[in-house]
């Protein structure tokens, strides 16, 4: 992932797509941590960007979950 993903783009994704993106980001974060530990990492900025991307994806997923829970748990309108 070369560029930071915009929140609007993330909101358009399904829960499965967000989960897949989160897995990819966590895998990249692991690889960057491993590179840093072995002294191969030259770009520290990418570590920070990936960490923020993970937080962004988790936030959007949490908001979507809460939005769906509130909508499903609302009582039906009385006639």
From Swiss-Prot:
Domain of life assignment: Bacteria
Gene3D superfamilies: 1.10.287.310
GO biological process, one term: translation
Cytoplasm listed as a keyword: no
GO CC annotations on file: cytosolic large ribosomal subunit
Keywords annotated in UniProt: Ribonucleoprotein, Ribosomal protein
InterPro entries the UniProt entry points to: Ribosomal_protein_uL29, Ribosomal_uL29, Ribosomal_uL29_sf
Entry's Gene Ontology molecular function annotations: structural constituent of ribosome
Keyword match Ribonucleoprotein: yes
Family named by the database record: Belongs to the universal ribosomal protein uL29 family.
Cross-referenced HAMAP family: Ribosomal_uL29 (MF_00374)
UniProt-recorded name of the protein: Large ribosomal subunit protein uL29
Organism of origin: Gluconacetobacter diazotrophicus (strain ATCC 49037 / DSM 5601 / CCUG 37298 / CIP 103539 / LMG 7603 / PAl5)
């Amino acid at each position: 992932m070369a560029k930071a993903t915009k929140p609007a783009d993330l909101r358009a994704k399904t829960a499965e797509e967000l989960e897949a993106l989160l897995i990819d980001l966590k895998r990249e974060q692991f690889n960057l941590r491993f590179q840093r530990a072995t002294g191969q990492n030259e770009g520290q900025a990418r570590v920070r960007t990936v960490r923020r991307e993970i937080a962004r994806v988790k936030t959007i997923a949490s908001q979507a979950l809460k939005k769906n829970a509130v909508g499903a748990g609302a009582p039906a309108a009385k006639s």
